[in-house]
Structure formats: C-alpha cells, structure tokens
Amino acid sequence: MTIALTGGGTGGHLAIVRCLLESAIKKNIECVYIGSQNGQDKAWFENEARFKEKFFLSSKGVVNQNKFGKISSLLHTLKLSKDCREIFKKYHIQAVFSVGGYSAAPASFAALFSHLPLFIHEQNSKSGSLNMLLKPFATKFFSAFEKEFSPYPVANKFFDNARIRKELKNIIFLGGSQGAQFINELALNLAPKLQEQNIKIIHQCGKNDFEKCKKHYQSLNIQADVFDFSSNLGEKMKNADLAISRAGASTLFELCANTLPAIFIPYPYATKNHQYFNAKFLQDQALCQIFTQDSINLDDFFKAMLKLNLEDISTRLQNIAQKNGGDILLEKALSNNLAFIR
C-alpha cells in the first residue's frame, strides 16, 4: 500500500509528517511526500531516504495577499493539483494524509478531485484556513483539541526521557530553532535571580542571538547550557524541571510527553492567536500558566515560577500526550476506511 503525506511549511507541521512516516514504515506502508519549495519542507526532507519519492512544488500561501494575489495563488494551486493527480497515478497512491499548511493545498485538492480518501490532522486549537475549508470534505479530521480526541503525534524520545519533577533545580528557555527574541531577553534578565536561587539555566536561543546570549552569560559568570539548535531536545528537556516557552502545538505536546511543566508566553502575532488557545487547553486543566508578552512583570513572573507545584503538574501531564500517536492515527484512518481504499 502507498499513501501520500503532504503539508508543512513550519517545523511543527513537519514533525508530524516525520512521525507519520515512521509509523507507516512499521506497518509496511510506503509513503510519497508532497511539500513545497518554500518554507522548511526541503530542509527537513530533501535527504530523507525513507520516502518512496519526494516532490517539492512551487506552492505558495493565499493568506495575507490582496484580492488579485489570492486569485493568482488559487489558480496556481489548481494547476499544481493537476500535477499531484499525475503523481497519484504514477505511484498508485491509495490515500492522502495532510498535516495542513499551504504546501498541503495542491495534494489535498487533488485527493478530492481523484476521489481518494483525504485524512487531515489539525495541529492547533484554531484550525488553519486550508483545514477549515477542507474539513467538510475530509474522510476523517483529527485534532487533539476537539471533543473527539485524537492523539498528537510526538516522537518517542520525548516520552522515553519523561520523569516526574519535584523541585526547581534546572530551567529551560525554549525560543525554538529560529529563536524568540522576547524569550531570549527574558532569560537574560532573569539570569541573576536564577543564579541567586542556584537554579541552572538551559537556553535554546536560535542562531541569531546565540553569540549575544553566550557572551551575556559569560559576563555574569553564569555557566549556562546555551545552544542555537539541538537534534536531541528530548535529552535537554529531561534535564529541566520547568520550561519557559512559546506555545506552538508541537512544542506544547512534546513538553506534555516529557511531563515537563511549563509557563507559556504565546507568540502574540500567531494566526487567530492560536498559540494562546493552544496553551489555554492546558491552563483550563490547571496544567500550566500563561503570561501574555505585553503583561510580564519580571518580579511577578519570577514569583510565579517559584510557586508552581511541579510534582502535581508533572504527574498529571502523563495523561495528556499519548505514546505512538502516529501509529494510532494511521490505524484510525486506514482500518476504518478500507472500503474506500482499493
């Protein structure tokens, strides 16, 4: 059996694709990847040999364009969807699994035009424009935030390194692989207070601020674990007792899998303010704290960190993320829809 995996643009989307690929391989399902020349798709998968084939199309987004730009992008997407139908025929694709993002549009529309089963995974609490449009036509729509709960695919390494936290000895600041300037500045401003409490610092600061952050810690004589990017983030999280982080869905569920308590500072310019609502999913269960970027007072923030009941939160986080989520999604998608797949 061969399926197409499509979507991407951001690391969060692409991490789900990778989980689904690994799950498909375990089930002896071959995968063709259809992404975009833009975004991070090529950087992630251009050299991924486990795909049967990879296609990086000239797809582009429709959001934030003027009227004529939207029309032009839609026409271009329809043209690319025709190319995807040829890919489906050539590789005998039997189903399409989309993780969203504009790079998923051509293959998703092609699935509908070709009468192939279309499965969609929405990663955020607020659906993206493409997923909202296609949801009524999808064979199955998966979301970890909806009442009909579906697991969020997270790499097993985050589960394998999980532990119950009891005391704040180490803190990790997660600005993402691209860095988050606000979180970087917050970490540097908190550093003297953390040193006074003998709390060790782990700091993912991104490439742009790496030298600046490293020099700042050195000037304070603080032995911080500063890095721009790590392929072994699960191990870094394992060493931490609390995370200060943005609230992208992948990061949020990786923290849950690792049972690592967090204070979230949602990116204020995220589409539909989805990072805030991602974090609110946990806050409503008393499993995190949220500070908006424009309301942070350094002293209040530091006090909130020290007051968290880490053991209680860490213990209850075990019930949020589900191991082998990719396996479960594929099982739900394919086993219940065999009538569609010939």
UniProtKB/Swiss-Prot annotation:
Its Enzyme Commission number(s) read 2.4.1.227
Substrates-to-products reaction catalysed:
di-trans,octa-cis-undecaprenyl diphospho-N-acetyl-alpha-D-muramoyl-L-alanyl-D-glutamyl-meso-2,6-diaminopimeloyl-D-alanyl-D-alanine + UDP-N-acetyl-alpha-D-glucosamine = di-trans,octa-cis-undecaprenyl diphospho-[N-acetyl-alpha-D-glucosaminyl-(1->4)]-N-acetyl-alpha-D-muramoyl-L-alanyl-D-glutamyl-meso-2,6-diaminopimeloyl-D-alanyl-D-alanine + UDP + H(+)
Kindly list the places in or outside the cell where this protein is found, as annotated in its UniProt entry.
Answer: Cell inner membrane
Q: Which GO terms describe its biological process?
A: carbohydrate metabolic process; cell division; cell wall organization; lipid glycosylation; peptidoglycan biosynthetic process; regulation of cell shape
The record's annotation in Gene3D superfamilies points to: Glycogen Phosphorylase B (3.40.50.2000)
- Extract one GO cellular component term from the record: plasma membrane
Q: In which pathway does it act?
A: Cell wall biogenesis; peptidoglycan biosynthesis
What Gene Ontology terms describe what this protein does at the molecular function level? Answer: UDP-N-acetyl-D-glucosamine:N-acetylmuramoyl-L-alanyl-D-glutamyl-meso-2,6-diaminopimelyl-D-alanyl-D-alanine-diphosphoundecaprenol 4-beta-N-acetylglucosaminlytransferase activity; undecaprenyldiphospho-muramoylpentapeptide beta-N-acetylglucosaminyltransferase activity
Tell me the InterPro entries matching this sequence.
GlcNAc_MurG, Glyco_trans_28_C, GlycoTrans_28_N
Q: Does the keyword Cell inner membrane apply?
A: yes
Q: Which domain of life is it from?
A: Bacteria
Tell me which positions the record assigns to the signal sequence: none
Q: Which principal EC class is assigned to this enzyme?
A: transferase
Keyword Cell inner membrane assigned: yes
Any idea what job this protein has? Cell wall formation. Catalyzes the transfer of a GlcNAc subunit on undecaprenyl-pyrophosphoryl-MurNAc-pentapeptide (lipid intermediate I) to form undecaprenyl-pyrophosphoryl-MurNAc-(pentapeptide)GlcNAc (lipid intermediate II).
What is the name of the protein in this document?
UDP-N-acetylglucosamine--N-acetylmuramyl-(pentapeptide) pyrophosphoryl-undecaprenol N-acetylglucosamine transferase
Please give the organism.
Answer: Campylobacter jejuni subsp. doylei (strain ATCC BAA-1458 / RM4099 / 269.97)
